[in-house]
Design a protein with these regions (language model features):
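Beta-rich, blade/repeat-based domains predominating
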Residues: 45-62, 93-112, 143-165, 198-220, ...
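Short loop/turn segments that connect beta-strands within beta-propeller blades
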Residues: 79-83, 129-133, 182-186, 235-239, ...
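Blade-level signature of beta-propeller repeat domains, shared across WD40, Kelch, NHL, RCC1
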Residues: 303-342
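Beta-propeller fold detector
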Residues: 31-41, 85-92, 135-142, 188-197, ...
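A short helix->beta-strand "capping" segment at the edge of beta-propeller domains
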Residues: 23-50
Length: 342
């Protein structure tokens, strides 16, 4: 199945910027956003490393905690309410030097929590405890197919944990495969899917398999095919299910889900855009809101967005008390927290 969300941004959505109680809002109800400067601050010790940020963060949907892998700094932990932030006491040089391209939370069968951190520069994936201790490393899957066996590059850009397996998107290589591993034994399975698309933009293949996200309700793997400005859905066996086109030139880096609504962080934006947007798309594929951090809030670092994620704040009994969107900028790096204002 093929869908096109929008062919013309102007015809599909009017981006509203209003002032309420002295605070600028951007986007369309029910997803209007307000920049939170206080919550966007990171620990002073990592400030020199932020301009080089090339990664993303993971939200633990059990606890609300956030983990953010940052090259040269290690791993930043954030509390459920985003008011507390600290750098985990990482001492392993391999982790400190890693170019963490994204972050994934995964729970082992015994309830222990770990993080998966793909490193596109060092060509591997780290499995790390939630205290920052290195547990294992996944190197290139040399025995998987002729591409890797012949010395093809392994430059992983994202991972997702689903059905007890770790799915690894190799988006910055010529292969563009999705490889599947057992993270607990640090071993690759013999299963993979995808590959490099041609100019015909074949379904099931990728221009850049940049981000991979589990849709929790449908149990699909949604893969942001950045170069082709689209999102492709697959089952856990790698069977292609659906294609959703985004505006040409938007270059989606990754997507995230909250109660059926999709947050899409884009590297650029359609023709005519001077800076990158985050889109909100509903469960029926309709574009219902848009926020552009640079244009709307004057965040000069946000010409390009490299990652965006929903951040619910959980109260007693798991009730969602607030909802934020987190975003990282690229080249230079930056970090922003935007509250969804009801």
């Amino acid at each position: 199945m093929n869908k096109t969300i929008i062919s013309s941004i102007g015809a599909a959505l009017v981006c509203v910027v209003a002032t309420v109680n002295g605070a600028d809002l951007a986007g369309s109800a029910p997803f209007q956003f307000r920049y939170d400067e206080a919550l966007s601050k990171l620990p002073d010790q990592v400030a020199p490393k932020v301009p080089g940020a090339h990664g993303g963060f993971a939200v633990d949907n059990k606890t609300g905690e956030v983990f953010f892998g940052l090259k040269g700094a290690g791993i930043i932990w954030m509390s459920n309410d985003l008011k507390e932030k600290k750098v985990l006491p990482v001492t392993e040089p391999m982790i400190l030097e890693g170019n963490f391209h994204n972050t994934t939370v995964l729970y082992r069968g015994d309830g222990e929590r770990f993080l998966a951190l793909p490193d596109n520069e060092k060509h591997r994936v780290y499995i790390v405890s939630d205290e920052g201790k290195l547990a294992s490393v996944l190197n290139s899957p040399m025995d998987l197919n002729d591409y890797y066996g012949g010395g093809g590059a392994f430059n992983p850009t994202d991972t997702e944990y689903a059905d007890g397996k770790l799915y690894v998107a190799d988006g910055y290589s010529a292969g563009n495969f999705i490889s599947i591993a057992d993270p607990w034994s640090a071993s690759w399975t013999d299963t993979y899917f995808g590959g490099k698309a041609s100019g015909a933009r074949e379904y099931g293949l990728f221009g850049t398999a940049h981000g991979i996200t589990l849709e929790p309700h449908t149990k699909r793997l949604a893969i942001a095919d950045r170069a082709n400005s689209r999102v492709q859905d697959f089952d856990f066996h790698g069977t292609f299910l659906e294609n959703v086109n985004l505006p040409a030139g938007s270059l989606p880096c990754d997507i995230d889900f909250f109660q059926g609504n999709v947050l899409v962080g884009c590297l650029r934006g359609p023709s005519g855009y001077q800076s990158a947007p985050c889109y909100v798309v509903d469960k029926d594929g309709n574009l219902i809101s848009e926020v552009n951090p640079k244009k709307d809030f004057g965040l000069e670092l946000f010409t390009h967005i490299h990652n965006a994620a929903w951040k619910p704040v959980y109260g007693k009994g798991g009730k969602v008390e607030k909802l934020y969107a987190l975003a990282t900028a690229w080249n230079p790096g930056g970090f922003a927290v935007m509250e969804v204002v009801k």
